[in-house]
């Protein structure tokens, strides 16, 4: 009997090829932590049969892989210069310069790099020939929207930061939805609601008049057609995949085309290298504390490093600290400095007692995944909002880097280590985070496949972006109701006055009788007229 198995296998293979898509990812030009997420996502997409391309500047370090390919272009940064630039920003912040000033400078570099990409005709023509099915935008660098428009390809947002932008279009009642960078929770008093409103207005003004116009000028410079505003491009996203989670985020209204996929990098702990395993195994009695401020913060200021070293040296626990730079003079004997460490594997070790961190989103999700309490010292960006949520959820303590003392840091560490409520809350949040349909990376690939299957999934998109400001806030309805109320007032006023005059007229006629013996002007005939006495009328014979 003839076997049809090879034919079925060939048919199945053909179906798989037909469903495969070409996807291009446009990561930000700096922040290696964002690139880690996209590499992980690209590998997951490869496993589902898709071909993924990362659009990166020349000289940016990334390990080669069969799971993705690279499209290089001459940009303003390579890995060395972008790291030096970022560290200079951190030194400026530590020296007292406003964080907002540094963020504006970062935005300027984003747009300069975007100008170089859009103006690179060889790059753009090469990308057009690829005929991509989908482009993934990281809104930290909005050039992805411009590239998608230039290529004429469907696009979706994958936000690697803790950011739920108003541009999504979801309702955001300021009474209980804290604005990004407000450092507020969903429980606000009057003054906090005032602050939240102020931050919201400043954010909208900043986006409308500072951020988006920079990219619009690039589109105008190169005469990109059809002409579109950045608002239209941002609103045109098929899907918004946000790196947050129900365990971390405050409950808020959302939309069908917004999905939470926070925790892409989380995974079970792997065995430690032999030298680290011996080190942590020697911390059986008191355990150990892990200290790391992420790949983006390599050099702390001397003042902060000394405060950390002093507080950590007073702990009975062992301490392992990811550290680069000059060794603090007051470093304790219990503290081990190391330039790189397997953070996830250490967080998953049974002897860990606490994590001292900058509050980076990837680090916090790994910490939550393993149920470890945390003390956070935010430095910039979404670190503050992330740690605000961690503290509000009872999983850790937030400290301000520019005001914290050695004693306060020591007390906070002792509190999260010795107070069991912090570990209990961390473990509960870990349960909530894991109790969802599939790992975050699998949920992400599912939704990417979904919008590919349904040609952008326009049925998920709300009509909020097709209505005007007046329609959204029902100002036209309010105007009509107000106008109706005013008209009703004048009509009722007119009718009331008319009825009053009629009644008064009838009453007046009844009072003006000329028959003897009846009232005339309210006075008995022949008695009084006004205040004086009057004569009787002559009798009629």
UniProtKB/Swiss-Prot annotation:
It is an enzyme of class 2 (transferase). PROSITE patterns: UDPGT. Catalyzes the transfer of galactose to ceramide, a key enzymatic step in the biosynthesis of galactocerebrosides, which are abundant sphingolipids of the myelin membrane of the central nervous system and peripheral nervous system. Galactosylates both hydroxy- and non-hydroxy fatty acid-containing ceramides and diglycerides. It catalyses: an N-acylsphing-4-enine + UDP-alpha-D-galactose = a beta-D-galactosyl-(1<->1')-N-acylsphing-4-enine + UDP + H(+); N-(2-hydroxy-hexanoyl)-sphing-4-enine + UDP-alpha-D-galactose = N-(2-hydroxy-hexanoyl)-beta-D-galactosyl-sphing-4-enine + UDP + H(+); N-(2-hydroxy-hexanoyl)-sphinganine + UDP-alpha-D-galactose = N-(2-hydroxyhexanoyl)-beta-D-galactosylsphinganine + UDP + H(+); an N-acyl-sphingoid base + UDP-alpha-D-galactose = a D-galactosylceramide + UDP + H(+). The keyword Endoplasmic reticulum applies. It comes from Mus musculus (Mouse). Residues 1-20 form the signal peptide. The keyword DNA repair does not apply. Its EC number is 2.4.1.47. It comes from the Eukaryota. This is 2-hydroxyacylsphingosine 1-beta-galactosyltransferase. Pfam families: UDPGT. Pathway: Sphingolipid metabolism; galactosylceramide biosynthesis. It is found in: Membrane; Endoplasmic reticulum. Glycans are attached at residues 78, 333, 442. GO terms for biological process: cytoskeleton organization; galactosylceramide biosynthetic process; glycolipid biosynthetic process; myelination; neuron projection morphogenesis; paranodal junction assembly; protein localization to paranode region of axon; response to immobilization stress. The chain crosses the membrane at residues 472-492. It is a single-pass membrane protein. GO terms for cellular component: endoplasmic reticulum; membrane. GO terms for molecular function: ceramide glucosyltransferase activity; N-acylsphingosine galactosyltransferase activity; UDP-galactose:glucosylceramide beta-1,4-galactosyltransferase activity. Residues 526-541 have a biased composition (Basic residues). Belongs to the UDP-glycosyltransferase family. Keywords: Endoplasmic reticulum, Glycoprotein, Glycosyltransferase, Lipid metabolism, Membrane, Signal, Sphingolipid metabolism, Transferase, Transmembrane, Transmembrane helix. Residues 518-541 are annotated as: Disordered.
């Amino acid at each position: 009997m003839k076997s049809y198995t090879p034919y079925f296998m060939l048919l199945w293979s053909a179906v798989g090829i037909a469903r495969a898509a070409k996807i291009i990812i446009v990561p930000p030009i700096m922040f290696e932590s964002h690139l880690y997420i996209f590499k992980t996502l690209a590998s997951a997409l490869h496993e589902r049969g898709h071909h993924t391309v990362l659009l990166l500047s020349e000289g940016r370090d990334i390990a080669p892989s069969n799971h993705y390919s690279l499209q290089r272009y001459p940009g303003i940064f390579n890995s060395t210069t972008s790291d030096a630039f970022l560290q200079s920003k951190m030194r400026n912040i530590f020296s007292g310069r406003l964080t907002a000033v540094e963020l504006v400078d970062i935005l300027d570099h984003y747009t300069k790099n975007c100008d170089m990409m859009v103006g690179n005709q060889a790059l753009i023509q090469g990308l057009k020939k690829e005929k991509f099915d989908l482009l993934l935008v990281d809104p930290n660098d909005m050039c992805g929207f411009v590239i998608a428009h230039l290529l004429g390809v469907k696009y979706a947002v994958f936000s690697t930061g803790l950011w739920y932008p108003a541009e999504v279009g979801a309702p955001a009642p300021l009474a209980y939805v804290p604005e990004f960078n407000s450092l507020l929770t969903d429980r606000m008093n009057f003054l906090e609601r005032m602050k939240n409103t102020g931050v919201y207005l400043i954010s909208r003004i900043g986006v409308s008049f500072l951020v988006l116009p920079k990219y619009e000028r690039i589109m105008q410079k190169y005469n990109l057609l059809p002409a579109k505003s950045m608002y239209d491009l941002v609103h045109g996203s098929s899907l918004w995949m946000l790196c947050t989670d129900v365990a971390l985020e405050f409950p808020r209204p959302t939309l069908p085309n917004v999905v939470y996929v926070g925790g892409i990098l989380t995974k079970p702990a792997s065995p430690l290298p032999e030298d680290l395993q011996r080190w942590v195994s020697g911390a059986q009695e008191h355990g150990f504390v892990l200290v790391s401020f992420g790949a983006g913060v390599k050099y702390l200021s001397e003042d902060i490093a000394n405060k950390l070293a002093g507080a950590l040296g007073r702990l009975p626990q062992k301490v392992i600290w990811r550290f680069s730079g000059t060794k603090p003079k007051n470093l304790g004997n219990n503290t081990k400095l190391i330039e790189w460490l397997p953070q996830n594997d250490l967080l998953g070790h049974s002897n860990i007692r606490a994590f001292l961190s900058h509050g980076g989103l990837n680090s916090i999700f790994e910490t939550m995944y393993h149920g470890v309490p945390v003390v956070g010292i935010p430095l910039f960006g979404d670190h503050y909002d992330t740690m605000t949520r961690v503290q509000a959820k009872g999983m850790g303590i937030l400290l301000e880097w520019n005001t914290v003392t050695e004693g306060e840091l020591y007390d906070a560490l002792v509190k999260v280590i010795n107070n069991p409520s912090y570990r209990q809350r961390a473990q509960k949040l870990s349960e909530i985070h894991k109790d969802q349909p599939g790992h975050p990376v699998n949920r992400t690939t599912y939704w990417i496949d979904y919008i590919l299957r349904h040609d952008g999934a326009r049925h998920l998109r709300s009509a909020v972006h097709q209505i005007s400001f007046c329609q959204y806030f029902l100002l036209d309805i309010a105007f009509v109701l107000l106008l109706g109320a005013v008209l009703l007032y004048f009509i009722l006023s007119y009718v009331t006055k008319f009825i009053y005059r009629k009644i008064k007229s009838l009453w007046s006629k009844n009072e003006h009788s000329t028959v003897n013996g009846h009232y005339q002007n309210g006075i008995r005939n022949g008695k009084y007229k006004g205040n004086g006495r009057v004569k009787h009328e002559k009798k009629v014979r």
